[in-house]
C-alpha cells in the first residue's frame, strides 16, 4: 500500500513539472489530481473492508473485566503477604543464629515449619523454651543414630564371624521345602482384613476433642500413640473399624497426623470425620472408657461401641473424660484393674496403644488375665490371687445347727488378746478343781 502511494506521488510530480514547462492549462492538472486521489481512496477503502472482515466486533464484558482486576489485586496482595512472611522468616533465622553464637541452647538445623511455630509464640521466654526443646530433641536423635550405627556394626561383625564359622563347618543350604512369604503379600493381607473391618467390623472410636487440654509436646506424643494403635489394629486377626471423631480439618491433630504419615494419610484404613460420635452412632450403643468411671467393665460386649479419649497418659487431668461423657449422657466404664492386678499406688491411666491391645485380646479370647498382661509390669506388683472363700449352701435345720456349733467352737478356742498374737499373752484356762487350787502357794506363804 505504501509502495503504491509513493509511486503515484512520483508520477504526479513529474507530470506537473512537464505541464508547467509546456504551458498547458490547469484543468488537466486538476483532472490528474482527482484521478490520483480517487485511486488512492479506492485502495484504502478496500484495505479497510478487509480489516473489518478479519477483525469482527467484540463486545466488552464488564463483569469479566472486574473479576480480572480483582484477581490482579488479590495476586498483588498474596505476593505482598508472601514477601512479608519471607522477610519475617529471615529475621527469625537471623535471631536463631545470633542466639547460637551467644552460646544458648539452639538446634543446629531448623525447618520452616519450626520457624513459623517460633513466630507464633508470643513471648521471648516461650521462644527460648521451644528452641531448647528442639535442641534437646536433636541431641537425642543424634545419640540414637550413633547407637544404631554401633549396633549395626557390631551385628555385622558378629554375622560375618558366624558366616565364616558356618562355611567352615557345613555347606550352604539353598533349597527348602518351605514357601517364602514376602512382606508385600503380608501387607496386602493386612489391608484386606482392614477393608473387611471397615465394611463389617465392630467400630472403635477415638474422641479427638482434647486438643485444647494438652501442650504441643503432649499432642505429639498422643499422635505417636494413635499411630501405634492403628498399627496394632492392622496386624491383629480381627481388627476394629477405627473412627477418629471430632477431627477438625487443619487442626493441630490433623496437621501432625498428615506430617507423621508422610503422604500416606489418605491411604490409611481409618474413618476420619469432623462429626462427633453422638451424631454418628446411637447413644444406647456407646460406652465411654475412662479410668474415673464408677462402673467396672465385667465382660466385653460385641454389640457395644467403645470410646477412648485421645489423651496422653502423662496428661493426668482427672475427671475430664468422665465430665465429657456425663455432659453427653453416655454410659461409662473402667477396666477391672483393681480386681485382677495388685495396683495400690499411682494413677490407673494407660496409653492408647495399650488400651487397643487389651480390647483386641478381649475381643478374640475374652480372657481378662491374658488381656491385662499388656499392662506394663512397672505399674503393678503382679496379678491378684482369687480369694478362696468356701460358701456353704445352708438349706435345712441341720446345716444351721452345724454353723452355730462351729461358731461356738471358734469362740472357745480363741485364746489370744486383741492387741497381740504372741504366746506370752495367751490366757490360762480356768478350772473348777479345788485340789489344784489348794496346791498353789500364795506369795506370803512362799516367804515363810
From Swiss-Prot:
Uppermost EC category: transferase
Cellular localization per UniProt: Mitochondrion matrix, Mitochondrion nucleoid
Reaction catalysed by this enzyme: adenosine(9) in tRNA + S-adenosyl-L-methionine = N(1)-methyladenosine(9) in tRNA + S-adenosyl-L-homocysteine + H(+); guanosine(9) in tRNA + S-adenosyl-L-methionine = N(1)-methylguanosine(9) in tRNA + S-adenosyl-L-homocysteine + H(+); an adenosine in mRNA + S-adenosyl-L-methionine = an N(1)-methyladenosine in mRNA + S-adenosyl-L-homocysteine + H(+)
Keywords assigned: Coiled coil, Methyltransferase, Mitochondrion, Mitochondrion nucleoid, S-adenosyl-L-methionine, Transferase, Transit peptide, tRNA processing
BP terms from Gene Ontology: methylation; mitochondrial tRNA 5'-end processing; mitochondrial tRNA processing; mRNA processing
Organism per entry: Xenopus tropicalis (Western clawed frog)
Protein name: tRNA methyltransferase 10 homolog C
Organelle transit peptide: 1-48
PANTHER family in the record: TRNA (GUANINE-9-) METHYLTRANSFERASE (PTHR13563), TRNA METHYLTRANSFERASE 10 HOMOLOG C (PTHR13563:SF5)
Domain of life: Eukaryota
InterPro entries: MT_TRM10-typ, MT_TRM10-typ_sf, Trm10_C_MTase_dom, tRNA_m1G_MeTrfase_euk, tRNA_MeTrfase_TRMD/TRM10
GO molecular-function terms, A-Z: tRNA (adenine(9)-N1)-methyltransferase activity; tRNA (guanosine(9)-N1)-methyltransferase activity; tRNA binding
Function recorded in the entry: Mitochondrial tRNA N(1)-methyltransferase involved in mitochondrial tRNA maturation. Component of mitochondrial ribonuclease P, which cleaves tRNA molecules in their 5'-ends. Together with hsd17b10/mrpp2, forms a subcomplex of the mitochondrial ribonuclease P, named MRPP1-MRPP2 subcomplex, which displays functions that are independent of the ribonuclease P activity. The MRPP1-MRPP2 subcomplex catalyzes the formation of N(1)-methylguanine and N(1)-methyladenine at position 9 (m1G9 and m1A9, respectively) in tRNAs; trmt10c/mrpp1 acting as the catalytic N(1)-methyltransferase subunit.
Domain SAM-dependent MTase TRM10-type: 190-382
Gene Ontology cellular component annotations, sorted alphabetically: mitochondrial nucleoid; mitochondrion
Gene from which this protein is expressed: trmt10c
The protein's assembly and partners: Component of mitochondrial ribonuclease P. Interacts with HSD17B10/MRPP2.
